Amino acid sequence: MILPSPPGADTYGCITRLDKQKVASVAYVSFGSVTATPPHELVALAEVLETSEAPFVCSLRNNSKVHFPNGFLDRTTSQGLVIPWTQFDVLAHTAVGVFTTHCGWNSLLESIAGGVPTIGRPFFSHQTLNGRVLENVWEIGLQLESGVFTKHGVLNSLDKNIRALQQLAKKDIGPNGISVDNFIALSDVVFNTKI
């Protein structure tokens, strides 16, 4: 895992902007420092980000920006940021609610450390295996339907991700859920403690 930047090193104003957002309301997108995302996938990603009207932080290599649709950066200035690498700090921020990733090992560990669910788009090598583990073993995220970015595929993955979280929440607060068990355990401690 990459160590965080020292406090106050908010070079791009990213953390300051995240501080103004609601908890779990920001989409974070990053494909690592090595991967070159295909231009048509960057276009689809930009369309999803703009259409969603959700706040976002997109951490990409500078040469990737030229593939966004004309005017995208201008139209989304108040909605999001497209900046170089700041991943650890971003994933540790409570405003981040979903992370779209290339499924690199460090990225997954940082996502877990930040408690952020993921949408995986592996590109090659170990990323493919990591993506399968993310979805099928750890169950902390989903991979894109077709394995590449399409507007429909990303929107569908977001929908599945939120439905999966809804089901977990319903289960946890249901009659036999962990929330009820924890409340009963707390009540036992409170009412059975001698003062």
Residues of each region from the PLM?
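Catalytic core of nucleotide-sugar-dependent glycosyltransferases
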Residues: 1-195
